[in-house]
Amino acid sequence: MDQEESHVISIFETVGAYFINIFYNFLYKNALYKKHSIVMEYQYQVKGYILGVKQNKKLYEKMLDSFYKYFCNITQINSKTLNFSNFVSTIVDSFLPKEYSQSISLEKKDSILELLLCDYISNLGTFITTEKMLPFIVKNRKENYHKVTKEMQDYSLTFLLKKRMELYNKFLRKQAYVEPETELEETYARLSSYNRSLLYQIEELTSEKKSFLEELSTLRKKYEKRQSEYRRLVQLLYQQIQRSSSSKTSYPLTKFIETLPSEHFSNEEYQKEASADQKVILREQEETELLREQELLASQEVTSKSPNNYPVPQSRTIVNKPSDNYPVPRSRSTKIDFDNSLQKQELHAKNGFSEKAIVEFNQDKQPMFKEEAIVEFNQDKPEIKEETIVEFNQNKQPMFKEEAILEFNQDKQPEFKETILDNKEILDNKEDILEEENQDEPIVQNPFLENFWKPEQKTFNQSGLFEESSDFSNDWSGGDVTLNFS
């Protein structure tokens, strides 16, 4: 080892001693003041110091000034003879060849020193915080002091020597390179180097593109395979639906098939069969609707027409649609009265009685068995109560049988005609009175009765009683019906 190399190694060892002292002692003391774990806090301190020197210019200048003072004390050189610029030149010249160190300006040397120190500090901090070194620095410091400091000094010296060799090689390559004579050649050389870098990037991108295309082709093959499998399964499902098309449960499945994308059904037969199924369904729906309409019309015709056996007399009752504000009064007749009247008429027709004979017989009967006679009797004798009337009706004998009515109709004499005419005059008088009483009653309109059934129409027979006639069919379609008769 010559004298020059020994001088360089002494400078590198001085640099290593200063920064090892900072990492081993100064940052460890700062970590002890925190309440967190010492290991974690020591790591935070090391990282903070490295980032501060790199990023904060003031902290870097402060660190460099303290290092300058330390260097003067260690080398025992007076600060007057070794100023700050000479200190920077001494450190940087130890990394560069002599032929180049004299030609470099002081500003460039400052920038070179900054790069060297920042790189050195970051690498030394990374080495200290490894799992191999960190436990020995934080724990059992007295026992492991010599061992740890020796390893740190060896790492520092080897790193600085390696860095010196790299800088030497850079300057040697620069010396071998022939400098361009003109600016045009210099720009050409710069652009050619930039072009080479672009070509290298293009090669990398093309290789990546090839790899991506290969992956895309494999994925496309997988997709086509799965798509064909999916189409096959859908076709099988469609065939199964066609086999069970006669059952009603197949209808939701056909709807499910129709919701699937059309690209899976390239078969034209499926499209034709699907359209035919839709036509059949629409035809069935139309037929059902026509049947319903025919049933409704038939029911309306049945309810609107009366039986042919029962002639309907002309009624004085006018049934119109009621206004929205008018309350509908209750009817004077009920379903029971209507059924009783129908049963009576059927019984008379079965036994051979005509309506004319029944009317004449009702005119010739004794007035004591009529409702009008009971009313006149009650008017003449108001002291007789309803109980006596009920007893009188219960005690009366069934003297008028159907056989007696037949014999009476056959054997009746012409002298009864005068009494019949008198009774007709009485009936005409009563009809006039009833017409005057019913003129003030409102005509009720009910829209619910027009389409379903016609109301009961009451007329007076020749004997002065109400005779019930109806346009009802034999089927009763409603409950109580509310009407007003004028």
Swiss-Prot record:
Compositionally biased residues, Polar residues: 300-323
Q: Which UniProt keywords apply?
A: Coiled coil, Glycoprotein, Host membrane, Late protein, Membrane, Transmembrane, Transmembrane helix
Which residues get glycosylated? Answer: N73, N83, N195, N461
The cellular location(s) given in this protein's UniProt record come to: Host membrane
Q: How does it sit in the membrane?
A: Single-pass membrane protein
Any one of the GO CC terms? membrane
Looking at the record, which segments are called Disordered?
299-329
Q: Which residues form a coiled coil?
A: 183-233
Spans through the membrane:
7-28
Induction, per UniProt? Expressed in the late phase of the viral replicative cycle.
Task: Tell me the protein family, please.
Answer: Belongs to the asfivirus B475L family.
Write the protein's name.
Uncharacterized protein B475L
The organism named in the record is African swine fever virus (isolate Tick/Malawi/Lil 20-1/1983) (ASFV)
